[in-house]
From Swiss-Prot:
It comes from Staphylococcus carnosus (strain TM300). InterPro entries: Met_Sox_Rdtase_MsrB (IPR028427), Met_Sox_Rdtase_MsrB_dom (IPR002579), Mss4-like_sf (IPR011057). This is Peptide methionine sulfoxide reductase MsrB. It catalyses: L-methionyl-[protein] + [thioredoxin]-disulfide + H2O = L-methionyl-(R)-S-oxide-[protein] + [thioredoxin]-dithiol. Keywords: Oxidoreductase. GO terms for molecular function: peptide-methionine (R)-S-oxide reductase activity. Belongs to the MsrB Met sulfoxide reductase family. It is an enzyme of class 1 (oxidoreductase). The active site is at C114. Its EC number is 1.8.4.12.
Length: 146
C-alpha cells in the first residue's frame, strides 16, 4: 500500500490536503485522466475511488459518481467563501479531498465527487496486485482488460 508522510507532500499537496485548498481547474494531473485503475488517499494509501465511477464533467477536476466505500470518506458541511457545500475528507488521514455536489449523472445516483488531483494518487489496474490492492480487482467490470 502506498503511503506518504505529511512532510513528504509538495506545497500544492499540503495546501490542498492539510489547509483545505483547491488546485487550479484544468491544470491538474487527473482532471482528464481515464486510465483503468484506482485513486488512493495521498497520505494513507487507502483506496477512495475507481476509474469505473470516474466521468467527464467539464468542471476541471476529477469527478466520480461515488466513493469506493462510504467508510473511507467523510462528508462535512463547508460554509467557506459565502457558500454552503459538502466537503469530502479522507476518513483515515483526515485530508481534504474536495467536495460533493448533486449535479452528477442521474443514472449513477446524481452525485459528483469533485476531487483535487493533489489529494490522491492513481494506481493503474495492472499494478493493483503488485502494490497490495489486488482485492479491488473484482470492482472492475472487465477484470482481464486494461
Amino acid at each position: 500500500m502506498l503511503k506518504k508522510n505529511k512532510d513528504e507532500l509538495n506545497d500544492l499537496e499540503y495546501l490542498v490536503t492539510q489547509e483545505n485548498g483547491t488546485e487550479p481547474p484544468f491544470q491538474n494531473e487527473y482532471w482528464n485522466h481515464f486510465e483503468k485503475g484506482i485513486y488512493v488517499d495521498k497520505l494513507s494509501g487507502k483506496p477512495l475511488f475507481t476509474s469505473e465511477e470516474k466521468f467527464e464533467s467539464d468542471c476541471g477536476w476529477p469527478s466520480f459518481s461515488k466513493a469506493l466505500s462510504d467508510d473511507e470518506v467523510v462528508e462535512l458541511v463547508d460554509k467557506s467563501f459565502g457558500m454552503v457545500r459538502t466537503e469530502v475528507r479522507s476518513e483515515d488521514s483526515n485530508s481534504h479531498l474536495g467536495h460533493v455536489f448533486n449535479d452528477g449523472p442521474a443514472e449513477t445516483g446524481g452525485l459528483r465527487y469533485c476531487i483535487n488531483s493533489a489529494a490522491v494518487q492513481f494506481i493503474p489496474y495492472d499494478k493493483l496486485e503488485e502494490l497490495g490492492y489486488g482485492d479491488l480487482i473484482p470492482h472492475f467490470k472487465d477484470q482481464g482488460e486494461k
